[in-house]
């Protein structure tokens, strides 16, 4: 049974691969299937719009689809993601997202010379301790965007 997991996540390919690898390991260990592919879909600006992961389950049963849904919710993927197969679709996901856009060109040179984005990440993750963390980022011409996902958007902001 072939399924498409449409992730409501702005993951760079390398970060999507991390999720694919974790899923593959669990699917292999349980004998329930395998990850067969994936992709990252971008907006015209180059910023990631969403991601997809292709999954093949060994047995085409409602029980296995529910098992996969529960697994994805336990692992933690963004809300409004979906599992799609044969014209069917179910919503999956438990995490809420927050994007932080850092201006990369309009501030004074001093700001860029003295400020480290890694410090910003560290401080934001520290403030979100136990609620959320950074999953990915994107560097555009004008902005660097940090993508955080966690249990509550309200508490993360």
Segments (PLM) and residue ranges:
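Intrinsically disordered, low-complexity segments enriched in Gly and acidic/Ser/Thr residues
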Residues: 112, 116-139
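Short amphipathic alpha-helices in soluble, non-transmembrane regions
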Residues: 19-23, 64-75, 117-124, 157
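Long amphipathic alpha-helical segments with strong coiled-coil/leucine-zipper propensity
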Residues: 46-91
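Short, extreme N-terminal segment that most often corresponds to the first beta-strand
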Residues: 1-24, 96-105
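Short, intrinsically disordered low-complexity segments
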Residues: 31-63, 133-155
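Surface-exposed beta-loop interaction hotspot
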Residues: 72-120
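Short, conserved charged micro-motifs
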Residues: 12-18, 60-68, 111, 153-157
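Short secondary-structure junctions
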Residues: 26-35, 76-78, 125-131
């Amino acid at each position: 049974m072939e399924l498409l997991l449409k992730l409501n996540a702005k993951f760079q390919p390398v970060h999507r691969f991390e999720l694919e690898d974790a899923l593959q390991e669990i699917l292999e260990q349980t004998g329930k299937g395998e990850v067969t592919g994936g992709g990252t879909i971008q907006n015209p600006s180059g910023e990631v719009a969403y991601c997809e992961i292709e999954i093949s389950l060994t047995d085409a049963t409602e029980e296995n689809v529910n098992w996969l849904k529960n697994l994805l919710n336990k692992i933690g993927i963004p809300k409004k993601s979906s599992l799609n197969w044969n014209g069917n679709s179910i919503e999956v996901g438990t995490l809420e997202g927050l994007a932080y856009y850092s201006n990369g060109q309009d501030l004074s040179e001093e700001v860029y010379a003295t400020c480290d984005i890694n410090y910003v990440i560290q401080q934001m993750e520290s403030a979100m301790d136990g609620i959320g963390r950074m999953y990915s980022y994107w560097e555009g011409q004008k902005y660097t965007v940090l993508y955080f996902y966690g249990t509550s958007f309200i508490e993360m902001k």
